[in-house]
Amino acid sequence: MYDKNLEKEYYQICEERGYFEIDGNKTIQEKDKNFCIMMPPPNVTGVLHIGHALTFTLQDIMTRYKRMDGYKVLYQPGLDHAGIATQNVVEKQLLTQGIKKEELGREEFIEKVWEWKEQSGGKILDQMRTLGITPAWSRLRFTMDEGLVNAVKKAFVELYDKRLIVRGNYMINWCTHDGALSDIEVEYKENKGKLYHIKYFLKDSDEFLVVATTRPETFFGDTAVMVHPDDERYAKFVDKEVILPISKKAIKIIADKHVEKEFGTGVVKVTPAHDMNDYEVGLRHNLDFISVFDEKGILNEHCLEFQGLERLEAREKIVAKLESLGFIEKIEEYNNQIGYCYRCNNIVEPYISKQWFVKKEIAQESIEKVALGESKFYPNHWINSFNAWMKDLRDWCISRQLWWGHQIPVYYCECSHEWASQHTPKTCPKCQSQNFKQDEDVLDTWFSSGLWAMSTLGWGNENWGKDKIWSEKDLKDFYPNSLLITGFDILFFWVARMMFQSTNVLHQLPFKDIYLHALVKDEQGRKMSKSLGNVIDPNESIKEYSADILRFTLALLAIQGRDIKLSNDKLLQVRNFTNKIYNAKNYLLLNESKFEDLENITLHSELAKYIYAKFQTCVKDVRENLDNYRFNDAANTLYKFFWDDFCDWGIELSKAEKSSVKELGSIFKEALKLLNPFMPFISEYLYHKLSDTELKTSPSIMISKYPKFKEQDKNIEKIFSLLIESIVSIRRAKSLIDLGNSKIEKAYIKFNDKKIKDEIKAYMNFIIMLAKCEQIEFSEEKLPKAICDVSENLEIFITLENVDLSGILTRLENQKNKLEKESFKLNSMLSNEKFIANAPKEVVEQNKEALENLKIQLEKISVELQNLRG
């Protein structure tokens, strides 16, 4: 059995030799063939999860394929500083020591973060190595390294100067724990809440309007109530005033089409400082904007006696007070969608705050270029999602209230001058004063990672890292990147932002091809979660099975546009495949001690020519599938060639022609090159075993040339296909009369194409040996009193003379009776309306499928009985 412990040793040898670097395959590189793929930089706090494993596996398959195909390859690795996540980790660590970050101050806290990063961050890099991926590790980047800090400042200043980055008071998404969030950092979830109907009395009147709201704690910030202009019920109240309960402040009744007449009573409160839609209404009607709580969600002086309470805690107390004063008409159960912080799961508040924004106009050029087809999406339907999101793009809030991250390079002088600068200024450019300070906020993490496709190639780095981790010609050679592979879930977080940030600078889309894979789920299609107990940890899978087995399993399941349904059964299936090709090596080495490279021999064996023809078909299909990112089809093609064509038939047929083994071994070695991008370690191991070499003292298979397709004579495939069909058909006929593994005296073959028998005669030894027949005769007529097996191109006859059929007939009748009982039982269940209505859908489907299978089995047994009875 294959020893998976070799994987670490093999990886280390290849990394030390520099095979993963740009010129690691120098000896086979072809002119003007460049390939670049960017690793989505995982969080420095992260560990390898199954989604990473899928992304990195698919990226590495393409990287290894292109490297072996003569391309100069850059697989760019990196880590993301992960602002909020990293700051939270270090803050919690300090709190265990009784230290708050505020006690340290910003500068010392950031030093602590860097210490943590060097000691504990980046564990995921070692886990990537165990997966066998081959990025150019010497070029490892970190989104806070000095070169990328320079690039971020350059990008910011250029956008600032173009007025594409602006600062202003906006209604934003605000997390009371993590600060400002962009729209896509808010996750909306179904919420079981309440709808409060509150009486707002008209000024100087006993009449009142009933206002329906889900947020009674914000009513101190109401600056109007509104009705729909076409709602006749309330037309007479428009422009009058109502009195706010408790505070007794008078506010106006306005008419606005934003109101849904059917919602609640048709009268809604307007709180412009605490609701996205009300914010727009406030602008339209020139209303006051009154914030009723601070950045931590604590109610302020506008809330009178409730000042100092936390917003959600205050709700019940405010409602209780309103009830005691008779202002609550009724409270209803109400389901709605509420936004939560994607990071800490805190309820997000619409909040007016002065923040930095990237204007949506930045995206226009990238939208136009995508429309021209300059980037292709795989699967193609993702272009529709991309276009829809870009069409509705809003200004992007990029400032974050953190200490860890890229501090915004904007400076404020006491003379009121504001300016952006790539380099730390010594004096104010307007008044020459030294009394200025830098903006305290940092940039959204996605701003720096949005530059990844070009900043890692040296753009904006100034001279930091030049000729060590990037070179002057990198942008020319590798931009646009050839391919991006990532999960569809970060299309808008990351991919779209790289598209518009890079295009705005370089006026070219950053990627030629974009492959978006689906989610990895369990075999039932459920998301993996600890609560369901269905999480497959790639680190554990690698320990139990091997990196190769995990990689090949993921590739087999990676169908474009479909979720990957991963299970231990699938991993076991690939383990069996691994054992199959390992045993093929054992068989070959039983017959020969060493095998030549295929290019150094001439094929003489007809069997070897046939297997070589099948191999060439495999080469063609694998290349075509990889070129179109159909990873599952490429993996399936390899699986079928090794399992069916080579192991099941090549090896079996070679037992009738031992002289073919030497040539088959050379073909097997060449096929291992085809497999190498998917299963780099076992292919390396088997290749050296068959070559009688060791990786320690020989070049790796990973820098050998990837097999190229060569057209073959189809006639040899036709002949051997008929031989195999004959063997299978004879075996099937023998099994019907319980002679499965016994040698029989004679079998008759009737070919549909009568001319073919003359060509087949030269290969009769294969049929005689593998079908276990002493003699084969060709027939042009059907034989009476014979068992018959009909297949696509031929019929097989075995005479029934001297064969006792009574036991066989009894066995088949018993099988038939048993299947009929099972079929009757399932039919009854599926005819029962109560069962169909109450049973889980998947159970009903399973029963329908089982019934279909029973019908097929019954039909087959009936045909067998009919044949045996004549």
Curated annotation (Swiss-Prot):
Residues 800-870 form a coiled coil. Keywords: Aminoacyl-tRNA synthetase, ATP-binding, Coiled coil, Cytoplasm, Ligase, Nucleotide-binding, Protein biosynthesis. A motif ('HIGH' region) lies at residues 42-52. Pfam families: Anticodon_1, tRNA-synt_1, Val_tRNA-synt_C. ATP binds at K530. It is found in: Cytoplasm. Its EC number is 6.1.1.9. One of its GO terms (biological process) is valyl-tRNA aminoacylation. A motif ('KMSKS' region) lies at residues 527-531. GO terms for cellular component: cytosol. GO terms for molecular function: aminoacyl-tRNA deacylase activity; ATP binding; valine-tRNA ligase activity. Gene3D superfamilies: 2.170.220.10, HUPs, Isoleucyl-tRNA Synthetase, Domain 1, Valyl-tRNA synthetase, C-terminal domain, Valyl/Leucyl/Isoleucyl-tRNA synthetase, editing domain. It catalyses: tRNA(Val) + L-valine + ATP = L-valyl-tRNA(Val) + AMP + diphosphate. InterPro entries: aa-tRNA-synth_I_CS, aa-tRNA-synth_Ia, Anticodon_Ia_Val, M/V/L/I-tRNA-synth_anticd-bd, Rossmann-like_a/b/a_fold, tRNA-bd_arm, tRNAsynth_Ia_anticodon-bd, Val-tRNA_synth_C_sf. Belongs to the class-I aminoacyl-tRNA synthetase family. ValS type 1 subfamily. ValRS has two distinct active sites: one for aminoacylation and one for editing. The misactivated threonine is translocated from the active site to the editing site. The C-terminal coiled-coil domain is crucial for aminoacylation activity. Monomer. Catalyzes the attachment of valine to tRNA(Val). As ValRS can inadvertently accommodate and process structurally similar amino acids such as threonine, to avoid such errors, it has a 'posttransfer' editing activity that hydrolyzes mischarged Thr-tRNA(Val) in a tRNA-dependent manner. This is Valine--tRNA ligase. The gene is valS.
